[in-house]
């Protein structure tokens, strides 16, 4: 999924039963809250070491998808990205795609219009999450990455161009 704000980290898990999330390890250091991701079988990663991060992502994804048969949520840009900011998609999603041989469902959204990256104040409006057609297994990494990024970015731009505002916005 696109990752523009904290909104989708709260909403997307609510939409799926027993979803696991790939998240930065630093979130597990938050007092009290930090004990929940490991207890819920999430995949915390050390973003300081690409090699260690990739190893834990692949091991965790295989466990979640093939052994536990749970959905996995990953933000392929690796971090929150402000509306209008360009950030490269990380190769980790393609490696997961190859390793687990499962369809990937891209998710476009416009949450950054109303709850910006690192913003305290929120704006009124209707956040839209759009689940796009699955990308079936079998593509090589380059073709998969191109299809994923094109799908998410194209649809997200359309959602950003036509925001649905509430009456009080």
What are these regions (language model features)?
Residues 14, 54-169:
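Non-catalytic C-terminal accessory region of glycerolipid acyltransferases
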Residues 1-50:
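Catalytic core of membrane glycerolipid acyltransferases/transacylases, capturing the structured
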């Amino acid at each position: 999924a696109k990752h523009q704000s904290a909104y989708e980290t709260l909403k997307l898990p609510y939409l799926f039963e027993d979803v696991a999330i790939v998240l930065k390890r630093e979130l597990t250091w938050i007092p009290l809250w930090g004990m929940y991701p490991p207890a819920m079988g999430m995949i915390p990663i050390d973003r300081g070491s690409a090699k260690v991060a990739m190893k834990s992502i692949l091991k965790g994804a295989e466990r979640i998808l093939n052994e536990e048969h749970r959905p996995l949520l990953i933000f392929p840009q690796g971090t929150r990205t402000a509306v209008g900011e360009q950030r490269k998609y990380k190769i980790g999603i393609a490696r997961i795609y190859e390793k687990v041989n499962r369809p990937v469902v891209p998710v476009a959204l416009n949450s950054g219009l109303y709850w910006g990256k690192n913003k305290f104040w929120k704006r009124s409006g209707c956040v839209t999450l759009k689940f796009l057609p699955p990308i079936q297994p079998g593509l090589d990494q380059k073709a998969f990455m191109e299809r994923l990024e094109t799908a998410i970015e194209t649809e997200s731009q359309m959602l950003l161009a036509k925001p649905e505002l509430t009456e009080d916005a």
